[in-house]
Every structure is written in C-alpha cells, then in structure tokens.
Design a protein with these regions (language model features):
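Short, conserved clusters of charged catalytic residues that mark active-site
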Residues: 5, 146-149, 159
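C-terminal capping/lid region of NAD(P)-dependent oxidoreductase domains
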Residues: 166-178
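Residue-level signal for well-ordered alpha-helical scaffold segments within enzymatic catalytic domains
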Residues: 9-12, 136-140, 163
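Rossmann-like dinucleotide-binding domain that binds NAD(P)(H)
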Residues: 1-51, 55-64, 68, 80-82, ...
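Residues at helix-coil transition
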Residues: 15, 139-143, 169
C-alpha cells in the first residue's frame, strides 16, 4: 500500500518514466510479503534529467527523509508523514484546530547559498485534507462537478508496480510502454 502512494506522488511530480529499475524483497526472517524496496524511475516525462529514487522498508528503526531533492542551487529535505492518520488515532476530527498540521521538527528544510553564505530556511507543509477527496466525490455525484482524481490516473501507477516487480525478479531495467 505504501509503495503505491510513493509511486503515485513521484508520477504526479515528475511524470511517467521511460524505464524502471527496482530491488524488491522480503528481508524479515519468515516474512511473507515484500517489506523493502528501492525503485529508480529513469527519465520521467516531466523532468527527464531528474534522478528519482523511491525507497521504503518496514525495518527502519530511524526515520529517513520522506523527500530529498538536490539541485545545482541547493537541496530540500523533508522528514515525516502526513499527520491526518495520526490525528484520527488521537481522536481529532477533520476541521478541528490543528487538524493535519505537522510539528515544526519535521518541516522541510531548504538549503541554498547566496553571495557565498549558506542560507537554510524551514517550510511547513500545507495541512492535509483527506475529507476533501470525499467532498469532491459527493459534489461530482450531486452537482456534476468534475472529479479532481479519476480512475484512469491509477493505470500508470499499476503499470509501474508491475514493471518494478518484473525488474526486481529479472534484475534488469524494464522499459515502460506508452
């Protein structure tokens, strides 16, 4: 489940890649389901010169950054997950004060240099709003408003997941069909 969301986020940001290379495995003793992956999206359509690496494991004792971007003029690093699930588990409801608002300790950090000086600035994420997804479906069904997300949008992600499994099994780069 987590892998599908990470792949979808990468496709939304960078586009569908020309090819994929993946290492997917069960690394827990006695494990029955994949619990580790590293996936490289090669030459994504919206940013063909960007190197996209996705990774996750259930066995991480220390958090890794959720997002890391490096460019010629700086880097951006972001830790932490969306707060909404944790908020629900703590009894908060959508629309209440601080719903989906992350702690400052996991704000994104932008590191740049200006006039030879290092400039580091923290940026909060926007508060999450999963309920907006369902509100949009309601408005679509009742008022014929357009859907913000359509079912066809999942097809590239499904194709990438299948190609990632093939790549991992065969140990090779797999081209993505159009």
């Amino acid at each position: 489940n987590l892998g599908a969301h990470v792949i979808d986020q990468a496709v939304q940001l960078f586009g569908v890649p020309e090819a994929i290379f993946a290492d997917i495995d069960i690394i827990r003793t006695g494990g029955l389901v994949d619990d580790y992956f590293v996936i490289h999206l090669l030459r994504p359509s919206k940013a063909p010169h960007v190197k996209v690496t996705l990774k996750s494991s259930y066995l991480m004792c220390e958090p890794e950054p959720r997002f890391v971007l490096h460019g010629t003029e700086g880097s951006f690093v972001k830790y932490g997950l969306d707060r909404q699930e944790a908020d629900l588990n703590e009894g908060l409801m959508p629309g209440t004060a601080n719903w989906g608002v992350e702690d400052e300790s996991i704000w994104g950090l932008l590191h740049t240099e200006k006039d030879g000086n290092i400039v580091r600035h923290k940026y909060p994420s926007l508060a999450g709003d999963y309920a907006g997804f369902y509100d949009n479906i309601h408005r679509h069904l009742r008022l014929s408003e357009p859907l913000l997300t359509d079912a066809a949008g999942v097809l590239p992600v499904i194709r990438l997941i299948e190609a990632a499994w093939e790549s991992s099994k065969e140990g090779k780069v797999v081209k993505i069909g159009k």
